[in-house]
Amino acid sequence: MSTYVYGIARSSHPSLPEKMGGIGDPPQPVRILVQGALAALVSDAPEDLRPKRRDLMAHQNVLAEAGAGGAVLPMRFGGISPDDDAVLAVLDEREEHYLERLRALDDKVEYNVKASHDEEAVLHRVLADNPELRGLSEANRAAGGGTYEQKLALGERVAAAVQQREASDAVLIQEALQAEATDVRPGPESGAWLANISFLVERDRADGFVAAIDKLQQANHHLVLQVNGPLPPYSFVE
């Protein structure tokens, strides 16, 4: 049977969740595979593994339980090896790399921040910051909306200004938060977000990081911030 891998820790980790229920129906018990200075948290892999909510939560719960007692390199959901021996071989081959990453992630968590614009609020912000656009908008309004060509020209200029604002706000968000983090990773780009950034934060500085997010939001009401964390540091495993 194939082996499902949740994460990698030091073999000296004090509280790895052996026999905890993992993925599968019924839940497969978590096992610990030890190779030298490393240990892998694994279980048997179901043949029909899919990203169902129950299994996603089980994966997360195993990592949360292990992470509460020490550094763990989290694997993303769906990591399967042919068997236990294949897992042990990887631990042996990449021992120094994994130990270096464990040292780098000791007592740290990940926060992911996604940002978008409140459409109405950002339009007000763009017009407030651009006297020329504001004048054109007011002139169109005074003329009963303006001609079709005037409306089109104004709309194009406003759209360009909003796009520029997206780029500058992405920079603003990273600069406002990175001082509270030890590392930063950009996430996958999406048309739904103007920024998708993961921050590696020391556990004892998490309150300061959250406070920086609150301060950023209070100063920029046109931003819609979606914050997810604290999380296992998926984006920083490398």
Curated annotation (Swiss-Prot):
Key words, A-Z: Gas vesicle
UniProt keyword ATP-binding present: no
Location, primary (coarse class): other
Protein's cellular compartments: Gas vesicle
Keyword Hydrolase: no
InterPro entries: GvpL/GvpF
Induction: Gas vesicle production is induced by growth conditions that promote production of secondary metabolites tiancimycin A and B.
Superkingdom per UniProt: Bacteria
Residues passing through the membrane, by range: none
Recorded GO CC terms: gas vesicle
GO biological process: gas vesicle organization
Family membership: Belongs to the gas vesicle GvpF/GvpL family.
Further remarks about this protein from its record: This strain probably produces some gas vesicles from the probable gvpO-gvpA-gvpF-gvpG-gvpJ-gvpL-gvpS-gvpK operon; it can be induced to produce more under certain growth conditions.
Subunit (UniProt): Binds GvpA.
Function statement: A minor component of the gas vesicle, may be involved in preventing GvpA aggregation during gas vesicle nucleation. Gas vesicles are hollow, gas filled proteinaceous nanostructures found in some microorganisms. It is not clear what function gas vesicles perform in soil bacteria.
Protein name per the record: Gas vesicle protein F
Organism taxonomic ancestry: Bacteria, Bacillati, Actinomycetota, Actinomycetes, Kitasatosporales
